[in-house]
């Protein structure tokens, strides 16, 4: 148990750093730090699967080694006897690298749409977007229903980052480019509404409890 604690408390962070620098050397220093912080936080979470599994791998390997050897060079033991433990660290690093890449692509997507919105004239003064779990409705300033684009093949602005059924809403808003989008919500803004806020910024007005 003391050996397990020693490895986790004094070696694990450096092992993670080494994996990140070796496999993702093309990431900026700040991006590498983000991945490292997420890995450390996750591995300290006692509810995570990897928390207990990696402890068991170290304990079993250490017990087997000590049974057959009188002395141990710790650095050699870690690098040559803890292959399963190292695979776990590799997996955790890859998981949060993928998360970072998706987040970066999402931000690039948002920035592209923001640039588009800011570069084009508005085609309508204002719209009301009634956003509900069961259905969403788009109304003009006279409260007449605006039809959504229903042909997915003709959606012009869909990216790899998508919002399933909300793609049609996004495409319609990007086609209309209203000066003001009044969003009527039943509950707190979800990820899609937050995305609309990021894209349309001060054009958005939120009304809760509608």
Ranges and model annotations:
Residues 1-167:
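Conserved mixed alpha/beta catalytic, RNA-binding, or beta-rich assembly cores of soluble enzyme
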Residues 142-210:
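C-terminal structured domains
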